[in-house]
Structures are given as C-alpha cells and as structure tokens.
C-alpha cells in the first residue's frame, strides 16, 4: 500500500511540476520581454489627437492657401501646447504607433534587388527629444523635408540589413524599393526599437514628413513630454479642461489626450494579455499549493505508517530533530526523483517548440532559470 502511495505521489508531483514549469516559462517570457528597452522612453509622455471641424475647412488649391489655412493654424496649436506650463517638449509625427495594431511599412533597398521591409515613422525633429531616442552615431541637425536625399534615422538592425554593418552607416544612401526615385541618406543610427513591450525588435526608419503629408492635408499626432512632478493621475483631464478652448484654432480643435501608460493598459486588455498573465499566475499559485499539500500528505502518510520504526530509532538514541531532517530529506529525494521524468517532458516540449516564444527565444538559459524557479517554489 505504501509503495502504491509513493508511486501515486511521484506521478502527481511529476505532472504538477511540468504544468508549473510551463506557466512559469510563460510568465518569464512576458517578464523578460517587458524588461527589454523599447528604444525610446514613454514615461511621462502623452499623445494628443487634433481633429478639424468640417464646416471650417477652407479648400486649399495652392501652396499659399495651404500655409495660410492649414499649416499656420497647426503651428499655432503646437505653439500653445508648448506654452502649457507642464510641457517640456512636443513633437508631431505620423505612422506606426506604440501599443496599437496601427503599422506603416515600407520596403528599402541599396541595389533595387534585395528589399528590407521596415516599420516607418514620419516625425518632426523634436520627436527625438520627446521620446528620448538614443542615437548611437550621427545627429539630426539636417532634418529637412525638402532635402534630397531625405535625411533618415535608422535602427542598428536596419543598417546591418542594408549595408551589412551598422559601423560607418552615417552618410550612406538607400532607396525606397517601390519608388526608386526617392532616396535617403542616413543621418544617424539609433538603438534597436520595437512596437510594444512584448514585441520583438525589428527594423525601423524615422524620416521627415513626406510630400503627400503636405499635399493631402493629413492630421499628424502630437506627442508631448511633461515634467515628472506634473504627471499626476488626473493630468489628462486637467490638460483637456485647460486647453480645450485655447486649442480651438480654426479649423482645428482638441479631440483627446491619453498617456501611453493608459494606452498600454487598454491594448493589453483588448489583446487578452492581461487576463492571460493573470491566469498563468493563478495556475502557478494553485499548483504550488497543490504540490505543497501533496508533499505534506505524503510526509504525513509515511510518518503514520512508520511510527514503529520512528519509535525504534528514538529508542536507539536518535533525536527528534535528526528524525525530522531524515524524513524531510526523503521528501526532497522523492521530489528530485519525480522531477527527473518531468524534466524530460519539459525538455521535449522545448525541443518541439511548444513553449511561449512570441516575445522571447526558447534558450537553455531560460529553461534552467524557469526550472530553478519551479524547484524553489
């Protein structure tokens, strides 16, 4: 009976060890990806959306009318935003956003044969200060949308893909794969970037606003960095209340303002990431408790069936502490024996690529860390 009980306990611990490892592995994948730098700093950064009143739009058929009725009012909106006491800096941009599914891609090449699909952001020069993008080489002093070739800031991996090395990439030129006449010159190389906490790094390019932005009267987003002491929970509501009337510069008006922290919360909830992580944590807690109860039950069962042996050992001079440590050692040995087949199952799962690898690679270092965490738990 005792042998059957031990075999049953070992199988129970093996199964729970495997499931606990899988959940810990998932949590580790999310945590490790979240700790990796995104290539920009979103703390104390807010996104403003400006809209326009259809009844106040003036048809612009010339460059002068565009400047008078579109770009000058937009510049006035930006000027008023920058004058707000809590604002450190503000910038306009268009293209790929963070914590959303909105992506803008373009293909780039150096030889018109090999194309590198790249994530694109069109930005004003102040964007690099607002987002605190670290430049590894070069600078953005020549940020001019009328220059030819157009200036561009590329991530290190894009420089590697285009030029086979990021070293010495500043000053080199590349082409728009789909519009061969559109040329770019690398002004700077920046750190690796990704679109959100759990995404993988990918090639990014940041360039000035293209010609169609000015011709088709696109509305850019506005990102602003505020002073840390002003970043309170109600800042967005306070800013909206203070600036709603001031930003009514025909044809524009303030539509909304949102922090990237809130945008991340909404995206995680919409994509199911938050409940997924919560479920994994609850499963880990459940199995930790389950294994603890199983080990305690096994310890209690073995102790009750070995009362005569324990009494004999005490009669022979063994102390209570020594017997306790012996039984605990046997329990740990049982756990070690049960973990051997569990480890084989876990290794097979890694080899079969059925673990969570969307955000983090399944490396042996990750495997050892997760197994160690399960053992400690």
Q: Would you name each region that the model predicts?
A:
Residues 2-8, 13:
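Single conserved hydrophobic/aromatic residue that forms the stacking wall/gate
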Residues 279-299:
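Selective detector of the "anchor" transmembrane alpha-helix that sits immediately C-terminal
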Residues 1, 293-333:
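Intracellular coupling helices
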Residues 22, 329-377:
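Small-residue-rich transmembrane alpha-helices
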Residues 26-115, 147, 346:
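Membrane-proximal extracellular/periplasmic loop immediately following the first transmembrane helix
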């Amino acid at each position: 009976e005792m042998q059957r009980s031990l075999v049953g306990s070992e199988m129970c611990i093996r199964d729970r060890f495997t499931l606990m490892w899988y959940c810990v592995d998932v949590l580790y994948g999310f945590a490790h990806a979240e700790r990796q730098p995104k290539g920009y700093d979103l703390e104390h950064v807010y996104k403003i959306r400006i809209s326009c009143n259809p009844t106040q739009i003036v048809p612009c058929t010339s460059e002068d009318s565009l400047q008078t009725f579109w770009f000058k009012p937009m510049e006035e909106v930006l000027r008023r935003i920058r004058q707000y006491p809590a604002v450190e800096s503000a910038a306009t941009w268009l293209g790929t956003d963070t914590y959303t599914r909105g992506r803008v891609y373009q293909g780039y090449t150096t030889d018109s044969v090999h194309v590198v699909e790249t994530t694109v952001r069109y930005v004003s020069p102040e964007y690099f200060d607002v987002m605190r993008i670290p430049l590894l080489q070069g600078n953005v002093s020549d940020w001019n949308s009328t220059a030819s070739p157009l200036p561009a800031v590329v991530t290190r991996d894009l420089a590697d893909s285009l030029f086979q090395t990021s070293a010495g990439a500043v000053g080199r030129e590349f082409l728009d794969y789909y519009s061969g006449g559109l040329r770019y010159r690398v002004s700077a190389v920046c750190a690796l970037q990704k679109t959100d906490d759990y995404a993988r790094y990918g090639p990014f390019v940041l360039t000035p606003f293209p010609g169609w932005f000015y011709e088709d009267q696109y509305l850019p987003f506005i990102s602003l960095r505020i002073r840390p002491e002003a970043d309170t929970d109600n800042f967005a509501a306070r800013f909206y209340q203070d600036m709603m009337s001031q930003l009514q510069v025909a044809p524009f008006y303030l539509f909304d303002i949102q922090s990237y922290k809130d945008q991340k919360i909404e995206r995680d909830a919409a994509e199911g990431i938050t409940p997924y992580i919560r479920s994994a944590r609850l499963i880990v807690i459940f199995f930790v408790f389950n294994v603890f109860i199983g080990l305690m039950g096994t310890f209690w069962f073995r102790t009750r069936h070995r009362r005569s042996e324990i009494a004999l050992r005490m009669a022979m001079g063994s102390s209570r502490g020594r017997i306790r440590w012996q039984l605990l050692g046997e329990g740990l040995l049982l756990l070690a024996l049960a973990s051997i087949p569990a480890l084989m199952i876990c290794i097979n799962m890694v080899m079969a690529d059925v673990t969570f690898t969307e955000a983090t690679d399944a490396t042996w270092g990750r495997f050892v860390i997760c197994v160690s965490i399960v053992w400690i738990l």
